[in-house]
Amino acid sequence: MPPKPHTTDDLVFLRGVQVTDAQGIVEFKTIFPGHYPGRVNHIHMKVHVGGGATQPAVEDAGHPGVAVYAGGHVAHTGQLFFPEDVSKFVEATHPYSSQKVRRTALDEDMVFNGQGGAESVAKLTPVTSTQLSDGYVATLVVAVDPDATPKLVGFGRPGRPR
C-alpha cells in the first residue's frame, strides 16, 4: 500500500474546470502528468452537473482571477489513464526521467485494477508523425448519468474544483 498522500486541496496548478459544449464534449490542453508513489501516470476527472462558475471566495484571494465552480452535484468521479508504452516513452524523456520515485506500471496500479481502469485508457494520436515529443491528442469517451450521485471512493476527501 502506498503512503497516504498529503492533501493538495489548496493547490491550483494543473487544475481546471471546463464546460462541455451542447454535445457534451470538452477539450483542454495540458502536459503529460507525472507520477507519485504507488500510482501510474493519470489525470483525475470529475463531472459536476447543475452548478456554475462564481467569483472567488475570500479564502481564494491568493489566487486572483481563479473562478470557483459551485452548486450542483457530482455525477462522476474517475481517472484517465494512458497506454503503458506511451507512459514509458514519456517517462524516459526530460524532465520526467529525473524523477527518483519508482513509476508504477499500469497493470500494477490499484485504481486501474480495482475500478475499471481498462475502460478509461485514452486513445492517443501523435500530433506529428515525425516527432513524438511534439505531443499527443488524447481521446476518451465517458458516459455519465447526469442524475447519478456516486459515493466517494478512495482516500482523502474531495477538493473543490477550481
What do the predicted segments below correspond to?
Residues 1-107, 145-151, 155-158:
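Beta-strand-dominated extracellular/periplasmic modules and repeats
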Residues 111:
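Short conserved active-site loop signatures built around small residues
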Residues 117, 122-162:
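C-terminal, well-folded lobe of enzymatic/effector domains
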